[in-house]
Amino acid sequence: MSVHAPAAPDLRTEVHDAARRARVASRTLATLSTETKNRALRAAADRVLMDAHLIIAGNERDLEKARAAGTPDAMLDRLALNPQRIDGVAAGLRQVASLPDPVGEVLRGNTLVNGLQLRQQRVPLGVVGIVYEGRPNVTVDAFGLTLKSGNAVLLRGSSSAAHSNAALVDSLRAALVAEGLDANAVQLLPSHDRASVTHLIQARGLVDVVIPRGGAGLIDAVVRDAQVPTIETGVGNCHVYVHSAADLDMAETILLNAKTRRPSVCNAAESVLIDAAIAEEAVPRLTKALQDAGVTVHADPTEEELRAEFLSMDIALAVVDGVDAAIAHVNEYGSGHTEAIVTADLAAAQRFTERVDAAAVMVNASTAFTDGEQFGFGAEIGISTQKLHARGPMGLPELTSTKWIVWGDGHTRPA
């Protein structure tokens, strides 16, 4: 996949003009009180519910087009909105309103010997671009999190959800206007032409950061072609390592949960590593448990399968010779998302957690727990698999930067 496609100058102008409007809106958003933002979020939730019939009508147009194109049922389900899901996205906005506001939080500060008073505090990023695939709920999630963190957002969703996203954004913008706020805090970019992505991710000086949400192809293309900072999210080749000191009952329960709970999400297990010391018993037992649950086990995996994010009822199985071999395997094939060890050996667990390079490392727990809500952060914009600027579940604090404030009393620096 490539997002680096030529486009007519008018599309470039359209995207850049939207970014300029977002920049203006972001300057006001950065100074809003917490109560004003919370009131706007609650108003947006009310408006989404009031406009549910319009949103569902738009969604039905998208679904009709998708069905005609032979879209698989799993993808249709991700695209679909119904009254219950509309209730869910509205509840999500109210939840964000209840979360602590990160803007203005003082992270550290002190008074220097010369009397200067320093403090470092959180400030919004500014203009955030979100590029995402066919889940219209992301439209509302992204709006809620960016508004609460004082950012303006440019949304570039999938053409498969064009009518759904347009209806949702119309409701969100109407709620902002009703609250006396700038509707350009949230804007939907054209999705009919892939080049709109190119113009968004190359709008250096207009857009502060772009966050791609979707499959590996989308994320790789955005990161490759972007000229503005990006935060990679989501690609998950997650492993469960069953150590020689593992309780196999526990290992089986954790493995089945990690693989089968929701196989199409980024925190699902895609590989299981079994210690050679227990392989004779553990391999047939865990293979049978997986197969009984409907999982296809790739027991002699190819290089491609070892690196695969299946997002399906498939899993690669490999035998490793001890904890260091497991660590080496994970660091070679993992995507830096979530890795898990099942063991009763504290030293082995500590070695694994210290040496595995991932955003989250689980000990005797399912990879499925890597989630902003499960971590107690509330909503999230995605799971960052990079190290700068954020790593792991991205909640409100991860949508901020910092500013140093220095107070003096006529201070000047000596020559």
From Swiss-Prot:
It catalyses: L-glutamate 5-semialdehyde + phosphate + NADP(+) = L-glutamyl 5-phosphate + NADPH + H(+). It is found in: Cytoplasm. Pathway: Amino-acid biosynthesis; L-proline biosynthesis; L-glutamate 5-semialdehyde from L-glutamate: step 2/2. Pfam families: Aldedh. One of its GO terms (biological process) is L-proline biosynthetic process. One of its GO terms (cellular component) is cytoplasm. Keywords: Amino-acid biosynthesis, Cytoplasm, NADP, Oxidoreductase, Proline biosynthesis. GO terms for molecular function: glutamate-5-semialdehyde dehydrogenase activity; NADP binding. Its main location: cytoplasm. Its EC number is 1.2.1.41. InterPro entries: Ald_DH/histidinol_DH, Ald_DH_C, Ald_DH_N, Aldehyde_DH_dom, Glu-5-SA_DH, GPR_dom. SUPFAM superfamilies: ALDH-like. HAMAP family: ProA (MF_00412). Belongs to the gamma-glutamyl phosphate reductase family. Catalyzes the NADPH-dependent reduction of L-glutamate 5-phosphate into L-glutamate 5-semialdehyde and phosphate. The product spontaneously undergoes cyclization to form 1-pyrroline-5-carboxylate. This is Gamma-glutamyl phosphate reductase. It comes from Mycobacterium sp. (strain KMS). The gene is proA.
